[in-house]
C-alpha cells in the first residue's frame, strides 16, 4: 500500500501458503477499498493434495492448505490458482492489467509448490518479462470513459446552488491535485477532503473548507 502511494507503481507481495496468505487479508482489504493496485502471489500445497480436488469434502489435506482464492474473491479484482505451468504467464498478465486498469485494486495469484518448481519454456516469456520493465507497462491506465464522467460532473455543478467538492485519494492517484486546486479557485467552489487525502490541499488554500469525518 505505502509503496504505491509513494512510487505510483503497483506493489508485488509474496506470501507463503496457509497462515501467510491469511495474514495478508487485512492489508488486501484495505487496498481494495482504497483502490490501491497490488499483486499478491501466494504459495500453495501441491495440486494433487488440494482438498477439494484430491478428496472433496475434506476441509484440509495438504500441509497448511487454505482455499485462499475463494477467500479473497470479494476483496480482489481477480484471483486465480495456477494449476498448470503453461497457465502462469497468462495469469500473471491478466492479474497485472486487472490491477492497474479501470478502478485500480489488488489481484491474487495462488501458485502450488509443484508449479513453482516446474520447467517453463523461457523463450515464450521473454516478451512479457521485457515489457514488465517498461514505463508504459508500469503506468496506471486511466479510465476510457472519463469524458462522459466529466460531463456529468460539470452538469451537476452547473445545476447546484451551493456546490462543494469532496475530494478523495483518487485525485492523488491520478496526479491531478493541481487541477483540483485550480478548479476550486477559479470556480470559487469550496473543497473538503476525506480522511485519507488530508495532504491534498493546504489548510490555508482559499478553497479549503475543512475535512470530513466519520459522521460528516
What is each of the regions a protein language model found here?
Residues 1-216:
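N-terminal alpha/beta PP-like core and its mobile active-site loop of ThDP/TPP-dependent enzymes
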Amino acid at each position: 500500500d505505502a509503496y504505491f502511494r509513494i512510487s505510483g507503481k503497483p506493489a508485488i507481495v509474496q506470501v507463503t501458503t496457509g497462515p501467510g496468505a491469511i495474514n495478508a487479508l487485512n492489508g488486501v482489504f484495505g487496498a481494495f477499498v482504497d483502490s490501491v493496485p497490488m499483486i499478491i502471489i501466494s504459495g500453495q500445497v501441491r495440486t494433487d493434495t488440494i482438498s477439494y480436488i484430491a478428496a472433496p469434502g475434506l476441509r484440509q489435506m495438504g500441509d497448511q492448505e487454505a482455499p485462499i482464492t475463494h477467500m479473497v474473491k470479494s476483496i480482489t479484482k481477480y484471483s486465480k490458482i495456477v494449476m498448470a505451468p503453461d497457465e502462469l504467464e497468462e495469469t500473471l498478465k491478466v492479474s497485472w492489467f486487472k490491477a492497474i486498469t479501470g478502478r485500480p485494486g489488488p489481484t491474487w495469484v495462488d501458485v502450488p509448490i509443484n508449479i513453482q518448481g516446474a520447467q517453463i519454456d523461457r523463450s515464450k516469456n521473454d516478451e512479457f518479462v521485457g515489457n514488465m520493465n517498461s514505463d508504459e507497462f508500469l503506468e496506471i491506465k486511466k479510465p476510457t470513459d472519463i469524458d462522459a464522467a466529466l460531463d456529468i460532473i460539470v452538469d451537476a455543478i452547473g445545476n447546484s446552488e451551493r456546490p462543494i467538492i469532496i475530494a478523495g485519494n483518487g485525485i492523488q492517484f491520478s496526479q491531478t491535485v493541481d487541477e483540483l486546486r485550480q478548479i476550486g479557485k477559479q470556480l470559487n467552489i469550496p473543497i473538503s477532503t476525506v480522511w485519507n487525502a488530508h495532504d491534498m490541499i493546504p489548510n490555508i488554500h482559499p478553497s479549503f473548507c475543512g475535512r470530513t469525518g466519520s459522521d460528516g
